[in-house]
Regions:
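Interfacial transmembrane-helix boundary/kink motif in multi-pass membrane proteins
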Residues: 2-14, 51-83, 93-105, 130-143, ...
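Residue-level signature of the transmembrane alpha-helical core
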Residues: 13, 36, 71, 106, ...
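Aromatic-anchored segments of alpha-helical transmembrane domains
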Residues: 13-21, 75-83, 148-157, 205-218
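Membrane-helix interface linkers and caps
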Residues: 27-70, 82-98, 131, 192, ...
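Membrane-interface helix termini and inter-helical loops of multi-pass transporters
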Residues: 55, 87-97, 159-168, 218-227
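Membrane-interface helix/loop boundary segments of multi-pass membrane proteins
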Residues: 119-149, 192-196
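Functionally important transmembrane alpha-helices
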Residues: 169-229
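C-terminal membrane module of polytopic membrane proteins
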Residues: 205-271
Length: 271
């Protein structure tokens, strides 16, 4: 495997262990260290490799449709999940919940969630995805590597957070893996198709802000979280994001390669 890929994966897992360990010891800043560890790892590897900001994807390029997908994808998927739950009486909203209250709370949560999304996406889609692409790793394998790394990266934090899930671990683990993999394929494709990291940042921030709002106190009087949770591991969410991932892959790829200015330096690529 390409040395910088190994360096990044080792660094991001190592920093996540440090942050989660601090969190388990009662040091709250450990949660922030964990959340920002993909960005920290990317900076470390970029400095060691002398890469600077090349290949991050800070430009706003590509077709607007990919940006719209990033904006509406998670609100639509969560609406389907919760809506189906309401339809079959597996979800009951709190008595004071309204569309306006959920929207206002989501907007209020958006700014901090954008910061956290930058912390993650500048590592996953801002470094690892384009690094694999520059080294001629096919898209399916690219997103699978990123998705598996993303899943494993969560493990220390999940173990440090006893209330992270109410599902038994044997059931939660495969569902969570499927949910994260579906997201990795979608967000990875937005990165490769637009050559920009921003669609992934937007999608991640919006999805996170809305999800945590919906899971806030009083929003649901009751919910069958196994099937209809708005989180990635909800079964309906897995189905919806899986369908989106399949549809995204059916979009024809452009025949022309990305411009040289968006590719990683030659010394990071296989000759």
């Amino acid at each position: 495997m390409v040395p910088n890929v190994v360096r990044f994966i080792g660094a991001v897992i190592g920093i996540s262990l440090i942050g989660s360990g601090a969190l388990m010891a009662g040091i709250d800043v450990g949660g922030l260290v964990f959340a920002m560890s993909p960005l920290i790892a990317a900076v470390i590897v970029r400095v060691v490799g002398g890469d600077g900001l090349r290949g991050v994807g800070l430009n706003w390029t590509g077709r607007q449709g990919w940006y719209w997908l990033a904006i509406v994808m998670f609100p639509a998927a969560m609406s389907v999940s919760v809506g189906l739950g309401l339809l079959v009486d597996a979800v009951e909203l709190g008595k004071d919940v309204s569309f306006a209250s959920v929207g206002t709370a989501t907007l209020a949560a958006l700014v901090p969630r954008i910061v956290l999304a930058v912390g993650e996406e500048f590592g996953w889609r801002g470094y690892l995805t384009p690094l694999l692409h520059a080294n001629r790793v096919p898209p399916l394998a690219n997103h699978a590597i990123v998705g598996l790394t993303w899943t494993i990266w969560h493990v220390p934090f999940i173990l440090a957070s006893p209330t992270f899930t109410n599902q038994p671990l044997w059931l939660f683990a495969p569902l969570f893996t499927l949910g994260v993999m579906a997201m990795a394929f979608i967000l990875g494709e937005t990165r490769l198709r637009t050559r920009s990291v921003w669609p992934a940042v937007y999608a991640h921030a919006i999805g996170s802000a809305l999800c945590y709002t919906l899971l806030g106190e009083g929003v649901f009087a009751r919910i069958d979280s196994l099937w209809f949770s708005p989180r990635p591991e909800g079964i309906v969410m897995i189905i919806v994001t899986g369908v989106i991932a399949i549809l995204v892959f059916r979009v024809p790829r452009p025949a022309t390669p990305p411009p040289a200015s968006d590719q990683l330096p030659q010394f990071l690529s296989i000759p």
